[in-house]
Amino acid sequence: MADIGLDIASLSAYTVENPTYHKNPKSLDAKLIYSLFIPCFGTGAIVFMLMRSMARGYEYEMNKCYGCDLCDDACPVRLFNAGDKLNIIYNTWNNEDDGVPMYSCLTCSACSNACPQLVDYDSYVDMRRALVVGGPPASNIPHTVLQAVLAAEAEEERDSDFISVEDYPIDSSIGYYPGCVDYLDQEMIFSHINEGEMNLGDATTSAFTLFEEMDKEVSYLGRDFLKCCGHDQKWQGMDEVFEKLKAYNQKKIQASGIDTLVSSCAECFRTFAKDYELEGIKVMHTTEFLTENGFDMNLKAEEDVTVTYHDPCRLGRQMEIYDGPRDLVTAVDGVELVEMEHHGEDALCCGVSSMMSCNEDSRALRVQRFDEVRATGADIMLTSCPKCVSHFECLKFEGDPKHDFEILDVVSFLARQVEAKKQA
C-alpha cells in the first residue's frame, strides 16, 4: 500500500459501521442468508418426504417380486405379445416403454393370482395406460362409436339428458343398475355378426323376474338416470373421462336414498364396489344378492341337464365370488354341474376386457375355453357377466357345429326355471 501512497490511517477514514459486525459492509450476514432459504428448504423437504413415501410404496411392490416367472406362465396373452410382467412394474416406475403392447393385457388378474408375493400387476397396467395421452390406439378399440358415445355423455352439457333424482321413480331402498349392455341397442355392436339375434338385456329382465318371485321391491336405476359406470374408460387409461362419470353417478346414487346397489354386470359391480366411494351403500352382484336373501324357489329343470360354469375375471379373481353362482345353479333339481379344467381362481379369461383388443389373439382364448366346455359334455355354459356372454356368443355365431352348447347368464338360467314352474 506504501507504493500507492495509502496507509492504514487513511483507509480507516472510509470505513462504515457494519450492523452485522463483518468487515465487508455489502456482504449479507450468514443468518440472513439462511433465513431466505428457510421457506424453500421447508416446503421442499415436505414435498420430498411426501413423494418419497409414495415412491416407497411402489418400490416396495417392485422389491416383492422374486423373478420366478409364475406370473408369465399364468398370463393368457404371453404367447402372443412376449410380455414380461416384471418389466411392467419397472417401466411404470421409470416411465419407459419396452415395446410390449400394453393394451393387449386383459387385466384379468391371473398373474397376481399366481404370484407368491401377490404383486398387483393390474394396477401398474392401469397407471401406464393413464400416462398415454389420448387413450389407446383406435386399432385396439373394435367398437369406436360405442366408446365415443360413452365418453361424450361424461361431459356436463349432457347432464340434462338424464332424469333428475327428484323426478325419477325410486320407491325402494334397493336399486338395480343394468349396465351399458342393456342400454345400448344390440344392433349397434353385434349386428354385423349375429343379425340382431343376441338379447343383451336378458340378464336385466331375468333379474326382475327373480326379484318379483322373491317378493323383493327393487328400483330400476336405468341409463336414463345414471351414466355409464366408467369401467371401460378407466381400464383404457381415460382417467379424466372416468372421473367425470364417477363424480356424476356417485352424487346421484348417494342422493337416491338407496342403501343397496345391485348389478348383474361383473364389470359394473366391480367398478362400483372398488373404484367408487359410496358411503352407506352396499354394492352387490345379482347372484350375491340372491344368495344372501335366501333365494330358494324349489326349482326343477324340465329335463335333466348338464351345465358348466365360467368364472368372470372381475367377479372371481377380483371380487372373490366363486361359490354363490354355483350354489344357485346346483340348487335346481335335475341340474348337474361339471367343472372345466380351469375353473375358480384358475379360470381362463373370455379374451376381451374393457371392449379392447377383440382380435385373433382373443379369439384363440375363446376357442381354448370352448374346447374345455366340450370336454365337460355340458349342454349349457353358464357365466355371471353379460359381457362374457356377448364375447362368447361372438365366437359361437361363426357357426362351428362343434360349439353346439347354449351360453347363458346364471340369472337368465334361473329365470327360465321360474317361468317353467309357473307354466307347469
Predicted feature locations:
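Secreted/processed peptides and extracellular or luminal domains of membrane proteins
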Residues: 71-77, 81, 111-117, 121, ...
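C-terminal amphipathic alpha-helical segment
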Residues: 293-332
